[in-house]
A protein has these predicted regions:
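Short gly/ser/thr-rich secondary-structure transition/capping motifs
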Residues: 19, 104-111, 174-178, 268
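Non-catalytic C-terminal accessory region of glycerolipid acyltransferases
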Residues: 47-91, 185-334
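A transmembrane-helix-recognition feature enriched in membrane-embedded lipid enzymes
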Residues: 82, 89-108, 147-151, 165-169, ...
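A residue-level signal for beta-strand positions that form part of recognition/binding surfaces
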Residues: 14, 108, 122, 151, ...
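An acidic- and aromatic-residue-enriched active-site/binding cleft used to recognize and process polar
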Residues: 32, 114, 157-159, 198-200, ...
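Intrinsically disordered, low-complexity regulatory regions of eukaryotic proteins
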Residues: 1-54
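Helix-to-loop junction immediately C-terminal to a conserved catalytic motif
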Residues: 99-129
Length: 334
């Protein structure tokens, strides 16, 4: 009779899964490849793909600490405001975070060509304008801050700055009056400046004229860029035209309330307050290659024909970029 084979009871403990069970105890399953059992391997894989998810408790704690510090600064007055009213602390901790759900989840904004924006130093961003309300300007401002850390100082119409609450918040978020003096002042201190030459003609145009650029005025933004010797970055925003499609403009009511237009959309005023909810269109913002003005010299700002031609060049770049991206997108909402 052959000798029986003796199986040792302890020939080395098999490796156990590195995960924990739902009640916080160590998992007793045998570990497979990667140190996790078959049950917990998918969860570990998800954490590897999204490392911030594993740090979520720490992220929440960090956010709470930042908000407490913010509250202390507001109560003690220990926060800077520049001489044009820009409150960086309020903007970064309150105003921009309020816009992020719209940017990330509602309009799902994609940005192209952010690398064309200089990391520092003065730059003039020139964009199309649309959407009934100037939300496109806010999305551009937020997108650039989140990807570059730069604050874009927007030039706003006097009407926007005169509105109660809105005007005050506009000033605190770094915006200023659309005039040459303020624009040059900001550029000469190294700021990124955003301008929308179409003005109310662009943001309040009917839906049938969507993505057709209106006049760019007399080229005031080009004169500013030439006098400051800064690059111009053309910006094309696709998606804002669909958030409040204007089907009619009640001019008598606009005159009565002192507004540039009184829009009628498919949902406003038909649905009352619900008509103020923008439609969830899919957005794309593209930043074109900079147009360098330094070599032209400041005296070029006094040449009306040169200013007109450069204005037309910037406008044409934006218009062609809009057409290109409209052709490429599958649907206004996806």
């Amino acid at each position: 009779m052959a000798d029986a084979r003796v199986i040792p009871l302890h020939q080395g403990e098999a490796a156990r899964c590195a995960a924990q069970t739902a009640d916080g105890r160590p998992c007793r399953n045998r570990a497979g490849a990667g140190g996790y059992c078959a049950r917990h391997a998918p969860e570990a894989s998800a954490r590897d793909r999204h490392p911030t998810a594993a740090l979520e408790p720490n992220a929440i704690q960090k956010w709470l600490e930042e908000m407490l510090a913010f509250a202390r600064r507001r109560m003690t007055g220990d926060y800077p405001i520049d001489d044009m009213g820009f409150d960086r602390d309020l903007t970064e901790h309150v105003l921009l975070p309020m816009l992020r759900p719209l940017y990330r989840s509602w309009w799902r904004v994609d940005q192209i060509g952010v690398e064309n924006i200089p990391a520092d130093g003065p730059v003039l961003l020139v964009s199309n304008h649309s959407g009934t309300l100037p939300l496109d300007a806010l999305m551009m401002k937020l997108g650039i801050f989140d990807q570059t850390g730069r604050h874009v100082r927007l030039l706003a119409a006097d009407l926007a700055l005169a509105l109660p609450v809105v005007g005050e918040l506009a000033r605190k978020s770094g915006n200023t009056l659309a005039c040459e003096e303020d624009a040059l002042r900001l550029l000469r201190t190294g700021e990124a400046l955003g301008v929308f030459p179409e003005g109310f003609k662009g943001v309040g145009k009917p839906f049938r004229e969507r993505y057709r650029l209106q006049r760019f005025g007399r080229g005031g933004f080009v004169e500013v860029a030439l006098r400051a010797g800064v690059p111009i970055v053309p910006v094309a925003i696709v998606g804002a035209e669909e958030i409040f499609p204007i089907v009619a403009n009640l001019k008598p009511l606009a005159r009565l309330f002192g507004l540039p237009y009184f829009p009628i959309t498919p949902t406003f005023p038909l649905l009352g307050p619900l008509g103020a909810i923008p439609l969830p269109s899919k957005w794309m913002i593209e930043y074109g290659e900079p147009i360098h003005t330094e070599s032209f010299g400041t005296e070029a700002a006094n040449d009306p024909m040169f200013v007109f031609n450069l204005t037309d060049q910037v406008r044409e770049v934006i218009q062609q970029t809009l057409f290109k991206n409209l052709i490429q997108r599958k649907n206004a909402f996806f």
